[in-house]
Protein backbone atom coordinates (compact mmCIF):
# COMPACT_ATOMS: atom_id res chain seq x y z
CA UNK A 1 0.00 0.00 0.00
CA UNK A 2 1.07 3.53 -0.70
CA UNK A 3 1.87 5.94 2.10
CA UNK A 4 -0.53 8.85 1.79
CA UNK A 5 -0.12 12.17 3.60
CA UNK A 6 -3.00 14.57 4.02
CA UNK A 7 -1.90 18.12 4.81
CA UNK A 8 -4.39 20.61 6.20
CA UNK A 9 -3.10 24.18 5.94
CA UNK A 10 -6.26 26.31 5.85
CA UNK A 11 -8.72 27.50 8.49
CA UNK A 12 -11.75 25.27 9.05
CA UNK A 13 -14.46 27.85 8.46
CA UNK A 14 -15.05 30.33 5.67
CA UNK A 15 -13.64 27.98 3.04
CA UNK A 16 -14.71 24.45 2.17
CA UNK A 17 -11.22 22.94 1.86
CA UNK A 18 -11.16 21.44 5.34
CA UNK A 19 -14.51 19.69 4.93
CA UNK A 20 -13.55 18.45 1.46
CA UNK A 21 -10.24 17.18 2.80
CA UNK A 22 -11.94 15.33 5.63
CA UNK A 23 -14.42 13.74 3.21
CA UNK A 24 -11.60 12.56 0.95
CA UNK A 25 -9.58 11.35 3.92
CA UNK A 26 -12.48 9.18 5.09
CA UNK A 27 -13.02 7.82 1.58
CA UNK A 28 -9.36 6.95 1.05
CA UNK A 29 -9.09 5.31 4.47
CA UNK A 30 -11.43 2.56 3.31
CA UNK A 31 -8.91 1.49 0.66
CA UNK A 32 -5.59 2.40 2.27
CA UNK A 33 -4.31 1.95 5.81
CA UNK A 34 -1.04 3.89 5.62
CA UNK A 35 -2.33 7.40 6.12
CA UNK A 36 -0.74 10.26 8.04
CA UNK A 37 -2.43 13.58 8.68
CA UNK A 38 -0.50 16.85 9.07
CA UNK A 39 -1.77 20.20 10.30
CA UNK A 40 0.39 23.19 9.42
CA UNK A 41 -0.13 26.94 9.31
CA UNK A 42 -3.77 27.85 9.87
CA UNK A 43 -4.62 24.17 9.43
CA UNK A 44 -3.92 23.64 13.12
CA UNK A 45 -7.30 25.25 13.79
CA UNK A 46 -8.98 22.21 12.19
CA UNK A 47 -8.44 20.26 15.42
CA UNK A 48 -9.02 23.00 17.97
CA UNK A 49 -11.59 22.17 20.66
CA UNK A 50 -14.58 24.33 21.59
CA UNK A 51 -15.17 25.92 18.21
CA UNK A 52 -18.48 27.72 17.68
CA UNK A 53 -18.95 27.89 13.91
CA UNK A 54 -22.71 28.31 14.26
CA UNK A 55 -22.00 31.88 15.39
CA UNK A 56 -20.69 32.61 11.89
CA UNK A 57 -23.45 30.55 10.25
CA UNK A 58 -21.15 27.64 9.46
CA UNK A 59 -21.51 23.92 10.15
CA UNK A 60 -19.35 22.27 12.79
CA UNK A 61 -17.73 19.45 10.83
CA UNK A 62 -14.47 19.52 12.80
CA UNK A 63 -15.87 17.15 15.42
CA UNK A 64 -15.86 14.53 12.66
CA UNK A 65 -12.07 14.39 12.93
CA UNK A 66 -12.63 12.46 16.18
CA UNK A 67 -13.88 9.43 14.23
CA UNK A 68 -10.66 9.01 12.23
CA UNK A 69 -9.15 6.48 14.70
CA UNK A 70 -12.19 4.26 14.05
CA UNK A 71 -11.08 4.22 10.40
CA UNK A 72 -7.57 3.10 11.35
CA UNK A 73 -5.98 6.54 11.16
CA UNK A 74 -3.78 7.25 14.16
CA UNK A 75 -0.89 9.40 12.91
CA UNK A 76 -1.69 13.07 13.49
CA UNK A 77 1.04 15.69 13.42
CA UNK A 78 0.95 19.39 14.30
CA UNK A 79 3.63 21.90 13.36
CA UNK A 80 5.28 23.33 16.46
CA UNK A 81 6.18 26.60 14.75
CA UNK A 82 2.57 27.06 13.62
CA UNK A 83 1.38 26.53 17.18
CA UNK A 84 3.80 29.10 18.59
CA UNK A 85 2.94 31.67 15.92
CA UNK A 86 -0.73 31.39 16.90
CA UNK A 87 -0.23 31.24 20.67
CA UNK A 88 -1.31 27.62 21.09
CA UNK A 89 0.97 25.38 23.10
CA UNK A 90 -0.95 22.56 24.79
CA UNK A 91 -1.78 19.19 23.26
CA UNK A 92 -4.96 19.24 25.34
CA UNK A 93 -6.31 22.11 23.20
CA UNK A 94 -6.94 19.65 20.37
CA UNK A 95 -9.60 17.04 19.56
CA UNK A 96 -7.17 14.19 18.90
CA UNK A 97 -4.01 12.80 20.42
CA UNK A 98 -1.44 14.57 18.28
CA UNK A 99 2.32 14.55 17.92
CA UNK A 100 3.93 17.97 17.79
CA UNK A 101 6.86 18.15 15.38
CA UNK A 102 9.16 20.85 14.09
CA UNK A 103 8.76 22.01 10.50
CA UNK A 104 11.91 20.08 9.58
CA UNK A 105 10.57 16.87 11.14
CA UNK A 106 7.29 17.29 9.25
CA UNK A 107 9.18 17.87 6.00
CA UNK A 108 11.17 14.67 6.57
CA UNK A 109 8.00 12.65 7.22
CA UNK A 110 6.38 14.07 4.09
CA UNK A 111 9.42 13.01 2.04
CA UNK A 112 8.63 9.40 2.96
CA UNK A 113 5.10 9.64 1.54
CA UNK A 114 4.17 8.29 -1.88
CA UNK A 115 1.37 10.82 -2.27
CA UNK A 116 0.77 14.19 -0.60
CA UNK A 117 -2.67 15.78 -0.73
CA UNK A 118 -2.99 19.37 0.51
CA UNK A 119 -6.16 21.04 1.74
Swiss-Prot record:
GO terms for biological process: tRNA processing. One of its GO terms (cellular component) is cytoplasm. InterPro entries: DsrEFH-like (IPR027396), Sulphur_relay_DsrE/F-like (IPR003787), Sulphur_relay_TusC (IPR037450), Sulphur_relay_TusC/DsrF (IPR017462). It comes from the Bacteria. It is found in: Cytoplasm. Keywords: Cytoplasm, tRNA processing. Belongs to the DsrF/TusC family. Part of a sulfur-relay system required for 2-thiolation of 5-methylaminomethyl-2-thiouridine (mnm(5)s(2)U) at tRNA wobble positions. Heterohexamer, formed by a dimer of trimers. The hexameric TusBCD complex contains 2 copies each of TusB, TusC and TusD. The TusBCD complex interacts with TusE. This is Protein TusC. It comes from Buchnera aphidicola subsp. Baizongia pistaciae (strain Bp).
Amino acid sequence: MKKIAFVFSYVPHGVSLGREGLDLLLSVSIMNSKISVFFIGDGIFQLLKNQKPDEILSKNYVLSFKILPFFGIYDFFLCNESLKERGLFKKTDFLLDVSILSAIEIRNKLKNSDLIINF
